[in-house]
């Protein structure tokens, strides 16, 4: 039996409303994941330069090795045949959906997807929701390390993500961490402020996931760290991120390493905690 025209109109309206509700119901974490996959596809189809220019925000940062505008940096690089593939494995979104971060693993092949030379990486991306509802990366940073024992492809999002009531600022409550680093040492400071599900990311090492693993690494190295005053800080709901410079000094006070650090802070059980902590050294001049 043929449908009448009014019935077709009603069905079309119902279908449109259903599709709209499904889009609206999409979780922010899922949207970040989908954005990551679209980003990776753009890199594969258009090249690394164009892909990053498209998905970095206008003021997005990269470390090259100093902090600089990511879009401008990629515009000034010559075209590259390199292949870059990745898997987001951890996504957390602020309570108001305005800010998010993702962590994942990646493989870089300088001469393209058939290149037998492979570099293994982990990255940290910070995402900011744009006026049109889409997300752009305001920071993209990564570390290199030997080939890991496994390369996960599934992603997770903390079950408590986005459920915290914000009563105080990360900017104020992070200060005691930096003070404690100076007065009581790195291990005690991180033991006090690291989240149980934190990622500690250090160049040359596969990331340490979880407070216990991170503290074990810090206790074995016991670095004397000096943090510079923050250069970049952004807070939205129960999530915040900060970036600046750090230096590591030996017992005589001589600087042995200098670089950029990024920290993601999240509010859990009324306390701001470090969710991700990345150090990326700046090579000494001449290297």
Predicted segments, located by residue:
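A solvent-exposed, acidic/Ser-Thr-rich amphipathic alpha-helical stretch
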Residues: 29-33, 47-98, 187-238, 255
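Generic short beta-strand segments
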Residues: 58-59, 103-109, 243-249
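Hydrophobic/aromatic beta-strand elements that line small-molecule binding cavities or substrate pockets
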Residues: 74-75, 88-93, 106-108, 122-129, ...
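Short beta-strand edge/turn micro-motifs at domain boundaries
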Residues: 118-155, 260-283
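Hydrophilic extracytoplasmic domains
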Residues: 224, 232, 238-287
